Amino acid sequence: MAEKNLEQMKEAVAEIREKMAAAAREAGRDPAAVQLCAACKTRTAQTVAASAALPIDVFGENHVQELCANFDAGAYCGKPSHFIGHLQTNKIKKVLGRASLIQSVDSEHLLNAIEKEAAKAGIVQDVLLEVNIGGEESKTGVAPEALWPLLDAAAAQEHIRVKGLMAIPPVNDDDARNRRYLAEVYKLFVQAGERGYPNVFMETLSMGMSGDFENAIREGATLVRIGTAIYGERDYSKKV
């Protein structure tokens, strides 16, 4: 499947929206409470700008270079942009002001570095804390038991506001197992909200991608990150 044209993207987003709404209703939730984040890794500014006319709520970027290029080119057409990839501390400055939400904070070291740069810029940066729910070495994120000290550290910051959690469960074909991982993340999300940390607002639960977004919504996701189902297969030879 090659990269889709505008008409194909339009059809894809309409189908995704229908599936999102059905999954939300199945769980007794308001479909309007779940946002669609278009994961636009490797897409050109022209493709991103074209998709901005579709019912996409927010754009998600994995690479700082692509976030900068698309943001500076106006490709998001006024819609919010989030950073959803692994963030290196030496690139934080470029993300601030371009990403309204950094979804992938996975260490106290990164948290402190964002605090430092946000203080210099005189802003309060919204973030999500990333949880490695499957304990996979190939993925970033904190172990579930390490979430609590990270929340303690985040609550003490003056220029960071925690808005929720992000997770990528292990890829598997077992539907029940997938839902168990997603349910575990939701449980952490609820527990974090109940603990009443200052400066922490459990509003956004970012989980679910092209292969499991319906399950994620059934298990409580408020934002799903979808790339290939919208845009088609990625051509990694084009961009970083």
Model-derived features: positions:
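Conserved alpha/beta-domain cores
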Residues: 1-187, 191-211, 219, 231-233
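Gly/Pro- and small hydrophobic-enriched strand-loop and loop-to-helix capping segments
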Residues: 221-239
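Gly/Pro-rich active-site loop or hairpin
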Residues: 141, 239-240
